[in-house]
Amino acid sequence: MRLRLICVGQKMPDWVSAGYNDYARRMPPELPLELTEIPMAHRGKNPDISRLMQRESDAILSAAGTRDRVVALEVGGRPWSTEKLASQLENWQQDGRDVAFLVGGPDGLADACRQRADQQWSLSPLTLPHPLVRILLAEQLYRAWTITRNHPYHRA
């Protein structure tokens, strides 16, 4: 089983790549965390936002496998505690399908991504910068895995 983070945006600052890579490297070989970056649609003067979101969402959905369990990261999604995420992770591992986490661009995910999602998850009611979401998600997935293994990283 693989955990796949599918994000809109490329050419992240070095600190973002370093933070994400640090946690991705910590994941065990049987549960790799992979990143797929989708180019952000160009937003010039007076852009047609719905058209740009649709273009980004088409690319996101084509990157997600047809059998993947899809989790859309959405402000309107359900909030999960770290312990709930650990429980989800155990369930996903038993299911065996890859899990694709969808992160939209600056305007979010189009309806097609939300409709394809098996679950919608809200990391926070705050608006988070998309580069930070990569690090936060990677850390929380690593933390959830450590909980399932009684690893001392998580001390709640």
Swiss-Prot record:
Its EC number is 2.1.1.177. The keyword rRNA processing applies. GO terms for cellular component: cytoplasm. SUPFAM superfamilies: alpha/beta knot. HAMAP family: 23SrRNA_methyltr_H. Belongs to the RNA methyltransferase RlmH family. This is Ribosomal RNA large subunit methyltransferase H. It comes from Marinobacter nauticus (strain ATCC 700491 / DSM 11845 / VT8).
